A protein has these predicted regions:
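ATP-binding pocket architecture of kinase catalytic cores
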Residues: 42-154
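Active-site acidic catalytic loop and adjacent metal/ATP-binding pocket
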Residues: 34-47, 51-52, 85, 198-247
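Active-site activation/catalytic loop segments of kinase-like enzymes and analogous catalytic loops
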Residues: 246-279, 295-310
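Protein kinase glycine-rich loop
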Residues: 29-32
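Active-site catalytic-loop/activation-segment of kinase and kinase-like phosphoryl-transfer enzymes
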Residues: 1, 159-206
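All-alpha amphipathic helical-bundle segments outside canonical DNA-binding/catalytic cores
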Residues: 134, 280-292
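ATP/Mg2+ or Mg2+-diphosphate-binding catalytic cores
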Residues: 299-333
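Juxta-kinase regulatory segment immediately upstream of eukaryotic protein kinase catalytic domains
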Residues: 1-25
């Protein structure tokens, strides 16, 4: 769907949502349609930029969205840069609006706009292997810092976020969708995915979930969600944050590079950065290839759940790699 069509569909609701926040908008532009419909808003009083998101209906409850804000605030207190929230006039994180053109109801939330370049754009297509290794070393250290915070943090009563456990990743209703039912798969593909899914669930059944390897994670630590500006790193887009294995976090970070030259070196840099901050056992590390495969499956489900977004090329690439990995999968335990 073209951006001008999306803007026309959601702009009236965005304008209405802004009335709930202490912002005097002078300009608003659509910047992204993915999980959410995201606008950049300029405050007419001082020219400061902000982010307004209309959150995907049905993906999170209001309690879940509020919990996201609670955790990003806790991360900020621990020294991890995140986007600071903007509260409504009556001190709430979110305001519900009706989307007249679709009949939807969406929660609108605002944060400060953070200047910078996401690492995926910073690297582009022509970055050297050494530069890519340096960036992924930094991402690994960031992941470890997140996990250090979450493993020592006690969520408040009522805290609600999804769990990327065996059921959340590979159960009958995975958080990112029933990947084996994507319409672009044939029967043989589906059989292969189902068989491998069952094999991996057997492995996960024996893999402990302790504070040393499982807890609150960002869950989408893709280089596109890490901003850099003058050496400062800011983590953005916590829409998928929840409880999960730390290895899934690392797999999510590495997956974008999986078909690029030097991928083993990228993984080594990621792990080295992580181990600079937090321990990661060799036994757990042997499961990273399996978690990369889980990430591939999850992405197929994510694409299947969002037919309104043209992900034709992404689906083809992820499908090819994931099916090949399923065909060669052997239980690591």
């Amino acid at each position: 769907m073209k951006n001008d069509v999306i803007a026309a569909r959601y702009m009236p609701a965005a304008v209405e949502a802004l009335k709930a926040f202490p912002i005097n908008p002078s300009r608003m532009e659509l910047v992204m349609i993915s999980e959410n419909v995201t606008f950049r808003v300029t405050n007419g009083d001082d020219g400061a930029p902000y982010v307004l998101r209309l959150h995907r209906p049905g993906y999170h409850t209001l309690a879940g969205l509020n919990s996201e804000r609670i955790w990003t605030g806790a991360l900020a207190e621990a020294g991890i840069a995140t986007q600071a929230p903007v509260l409504t006039h009556d001190a709430r994180y979110f305001h519900q609006v009706d989307i007249a053109n679709t009949g939807e109801q969406r929660y609108a939330g605002m944060t400060e706009w953070v200047e910078g370049t996401v690492i995926s754009d910073y690297l582009g297509e022509n970055a050297s292997l050494e530069e890519r290794k340096r960036c992924f070393h930094q991402i690994g250290a960031l992941a470890a810092t997140i996990h250090n915070q979450s493993s020592s943090w006690t969520p408040p009563a009522g805290f609600e976020r999804p769990s990327y456990d065996s059921d959340g990743l590979l159960g009958e209703a995975p958080l990112w969708g029933r990947f084996w039912e994507h319409p672009g798969l044939d029967r043989a593909d589906t059989v292969l995915l189902q068989r491998t899914r069952s094999q991996i669930r057997e492995v996960l059944r024996d893999f402990q979930t302790a504070s040393t390897n499982f807890g609150m994670i960002h869950a989408d630590l893709d280089p596109a969600n890490v901003l850099v500006q003058d050496g400062r790193v800011t983590l953005i887009d916590f829409d998928d944050a929840g409880y999960g294995w730390h290895l899934y976090e690392l797999a999510a970070a590495a997956f974008a590079e999986i078909e690029k030259p030097g991928f083993p070196d990228i993984c080594q840099a990621l792990i080295a950065g992580y181990r600079d901050i937090r321990a990661l056992s060799e036994r757990d590390l042997t499961l990273l290839p399996m978690f990369l495969l889980i990430r591939g499956m999850a992405l197929i489900g994510w694409i299947s759940e969002r037919p309104e977004i043209d992900n034709t090329d992404l689906f083809r690439e992820v499908k090819e790699w994931t099916l090949a990995s399923c065909a060669s999968f052997k239980s690591p335990m």
